[in-house]
UniProtKB/Swiss-Prot annotation:
Gene assigned in the entry: uppP
One cellular component (GO) term of this entry: plasma membrane
Cell compartments where the protein resides: Cell membrane
Taxonomic placement: Bacteria, Bacillati, Bacillota, Bacilli, Lactobacillales
Descriptive protein name: Undecaprenyl-diphosphatase
Task performed by this protein: Catalyzes the dephosphorylation of undecaprenyl diphosphate (UPP). Confers resistance to bacitracin.
Pfam (any one): BacA
């Protein structure tokens, strides 16, 4: 009977991992904050695992979502793709150089502030404030953007300086509730790129950023003396695979969506969610 109960509990853990993977796959690419959603979802659907594992899980799971970008854009991102002309190969290498340049600010500040941010800012109130602030920012920027023609409508024409500026906006995403994609897309629009260019560059920028951040979290996890059981590895794998599959659909949806729409609806969603998170955090603080 005990074995049956343990098996049932483990199956429930795997189902939770599937749900968390779905949340990650949706929220990683839409500018609505994957970390903010995972913090909220974990309150109601918490894995029966150690805090250290959950903290690592919430970050390393991003690799599944990032892998979806590599699959969808493989030909475009691969400088060794058969059939590419010398000009196309050159543009691909230049694209990667822009991505590397854009990663520099977040790599520096991420390493410097990661532990402090996790200790002091991973709470409901910070997440709620960031959701609302960036929600308002999206609505305001999109309203202003209707009267301004983008200066950069082709990623190949984006300068290295513009890439660096977008990288500076990515630094803001180390604050929980901001949204990495939200910060970089908003930054791209502010510095003069079209929505599609900002979204594309956001996807590409996520590859080294999230691989690096996930690697850092995994290393810290093991340095702190933690181990990874077979059951935990399976939970992480299930969530990552789910995030990968969902991301394949979400990325394509977003790229089709922004051809005819702006990001205002996501701004409104962030404001509503931020108010809900703030209310929940206040209730939890008062009543425990």
């Amino acid at each position: 009977m005990e074995i049956i109960m343990q098996t049932a509990q483990y199956i429930i853990e795997l189902l939770k991992a599937v749900f968390l993977g779905i949340v990650e796959g949706i929220t990683e690419w839409l500018p609505i904050s994957s970390t903010g959603h995972l913090i909220l979802v974990n309150e109601f659907l918490n894995l029966r695992q150690s805090k250290d594992f959950i903290d690592m899980f919430n970050i390393v799971m991003h690799l599944g979502a990032i892998l979806a970008v590599m699959v969808i854009y493989f030909k475009r991102l691969n400088p060794f793709q058969p059939g590419k002309t010398a000009r196309e190969v050159q543009l691909t290498w230049k694209l990667w150089l822009k991505v590397v340049i854009a990663c520099i600010p977040s790599a520096f500040f991420g390493l410097l502030l990661d532990d402090w941010m996790e200790a002091h800012l991973s709470n409901f109130f910070v997440v709620a404030i960031m959701l609302v602030v960036y929600g308002i920012a999206f609505i305001w920027i999109e309203d202003r953007n209707r009267r301004v023609d983008p200066k950069v409508t082709d990623l190949a024409r984006m300068s290295y300086k513009t890439a660096f500026y977008i990288g500076l906006f990515q630094v803001l995403s180390i604050i929980p509730g901001t949204s990495r994609s939200g910060a970089t897309i908003l930054g791209g629009i502010i510095v003069g790129t079209s929505r599609s260019v900002a979204a594309d560059f956001t996807f590409f920028l996520g590859i080294p950023t999230m691989f690096g951040y996930s690697g850092l979290k995994a290393v810290k996890y093991f340095i702190d003396g933690n181990t990874l059981t077979g059951g935990q590895a399976a939970i992480l794998l299930v969530a990552s695979v789910t995030a990968f599959l969902v991301s394949l659909f979400v990325i394509r949806f977003l790229m089709n969506y922004i051809k005819k729409h702006d990001f205002t609806v996501f701004g409104k969603y962030r404001i509503v969610l931020g108010i809900i998170v703030l209310f929940y955090g206040a209730v939890k603080l008062i009543f425990g």
